């Protein structure tokens, strides 16, 4: 097997710097002429390796020159080896020459060569960059037909490519291809399918994907559970959310309080206060210790319903468990009192809180999906963003907020 000179000399780099669309054939001819291959043209077919040269041309965005070298060497019976074919295919795909890349792929898949998974992965990434999802689907079908042993890995790559780009029909096509070949989904792939359906699909399709996970005895992971919970919350399907959480199993301690907090959130969003209290007690009875998010979900509901006594009990419970309030907790207190024009009574409450701490938001963002952020919370975030260098405390933020509210009321009454 012959090999082109693997390094580009300074004169070659100068030559490439003068590249224009019409100069590709002449540049290719000069590169070939100054390589070892120029002395080996014969009638006999020979296999050659010039992958490093192609890779350099690809990096310099010169796929036309690489293509000309490919054509000119092939015309004199110098055929590229597998490594060079892969380099050419990636060079074309990464530079947007899809038809050329497909031609090389067809040559590889219909030969005795077995595609390399790493190369297939890079090819799929290149097609994804240009939105050529049909080409990715073709790769999967070709692998299924010719090299079925590679199908599990290639299918996982394709599913990930389609899923993250919302190409759910193509993703489902890959799953059906796997089913027809009797290839089982790996746990990680099955989980990602659930996640992508929760991002881009309907609830019915998401539930079907979750059913597939259950059918094969695969444990659904935390990231996927969060994605499913978020999908239910966005569409306010709280009953279906609770059914899902119950099915997953509220006793899964490796997930912390996420499952229980999601149950509480589903009741808080509907302001079903008795059910909220019942599930909170159920959480304690199950041996789970409430965290900041647990208390803030309850506090948000109590604040909106102006249930001051329940709000005070929540703060007392937090103190007993040494759970430090965050900006959300302060917002619940401030908003509840301000909404009822009880600003004078605020001092009685917040003097027992961590007023001189730096403001932080440590609550799970899922809580804001249905309960939103209160007026004090939003106002404080705007203040912190506008002047981040100041040493803000909760006390200062409350002072700024009360002044703003007072000014707003004065303007209102002046008109």
UniProtKB/Swiss-Prot annotation:
Transmembrane segments: none annotated. Pfam families: PPR (PF01535). PPR repeats lie at residues 46-80, 81-115, 116-150, 151-185, 186-220, 221-255, 256-290, 291-325, 326-360. The keyword Repeat applies. InterPro entries: Pentatricopeptide_rpt, TPR-like_helical_dom_sf. It comes from the Eukaryota. Keywords: Repeat. Coiled coil: none annotated. Gene3D superfamilies: Tetratricopeptide repeat domain. Signal peptide: none annotated. The keyword Repeat applies. Belongs to the PPR family. P subfamily. PANTHER family: OS08G0520200 PROTEIN. This is Pentatricopeptide repeat-containing protein At3g42630. It comes from Arabidopsis thaliana.
């Amino acid at each position: 097997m012959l090999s082109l000179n693997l390094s580009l000399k300074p004169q070659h780099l100068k030559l490439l710097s003068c590249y224009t669309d019409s100069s590709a054939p002449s540049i290719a001819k000069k590169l070939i002429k100054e390589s070892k291959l120029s002395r080996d043209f014969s009638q006999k077919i020979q296999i050659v390796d010039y992958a490093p040269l192609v890779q350099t041309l690809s990096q310099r965005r010169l796929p036309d020159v690489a293509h000309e070298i490919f054509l000119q060497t092939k015309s004199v019976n110098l055929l590229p080896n597998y490594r060079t074919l892969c380099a050419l295919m990636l060079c074309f795909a990464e530079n947007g020459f899809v038809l050329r890349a497909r031609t090389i792929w067809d040559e590889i898949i219909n030969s005795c060569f077995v595609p390399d998974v790493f190369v297939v992965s890079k090819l799929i990434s290149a097609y994804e960059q240009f939105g050529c999802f049909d080409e990715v689907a073709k790769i999967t079908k070709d692998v299924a037909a010719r090299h079925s042993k590679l199908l599990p890995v290639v299918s996982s790559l394709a599913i990930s490519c389609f899923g993250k780009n919302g190409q759910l029909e193509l993703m489902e096509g890959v799953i059906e291809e796997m089913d027809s070949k009797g290839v089982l989904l790996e746990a990680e792939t099955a989980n990602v399918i659930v996640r992508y359906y929760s991002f881009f699909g309907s609830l019915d399709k998401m539930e079907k994907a979750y059913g597939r996970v259950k059918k094969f005895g695969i444990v659904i992971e935390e990231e996927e559970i969060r994605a499913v919970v978020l999908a239910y919350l966005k569409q306010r399907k709280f009953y279906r959310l609770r059914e899902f959480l119950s099915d997953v199993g509220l006793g899964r301690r490796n997930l912390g309080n996420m499952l229980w907090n999601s149950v509480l959130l589903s009741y808080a969003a509907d302001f079903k206060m008795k059910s909220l209290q019942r599930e909170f007690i159920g959480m304690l009875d199950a041996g789970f210790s409430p965290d900041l998010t647990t208390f803030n979900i309850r506090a948000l509901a109590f604040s909106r319903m102006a249930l001051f006594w329940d709000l005070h009990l929540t703060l007392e419970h937090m103190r007993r468990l040494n759970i430090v309030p965050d900006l959300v907790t302060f917002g619940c207190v401030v908003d509840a009192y301000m909404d009822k024009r009880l600003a004078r009574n605020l001092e009685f409450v917040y003097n027992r809180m961590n007023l001189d701490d730096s403001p932080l938001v440590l609550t799970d963002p899922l809580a804001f999906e249905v309960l939103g952020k209160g007026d004090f919370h939003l106002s404080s975030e705007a203040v912190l963003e506008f002047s981040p260098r100041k040493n803000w405390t909760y006390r200062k933020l409350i002072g700024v907020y009360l002044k703003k509210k007072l000014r707003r009321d004065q303007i209102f009454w002046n008109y």
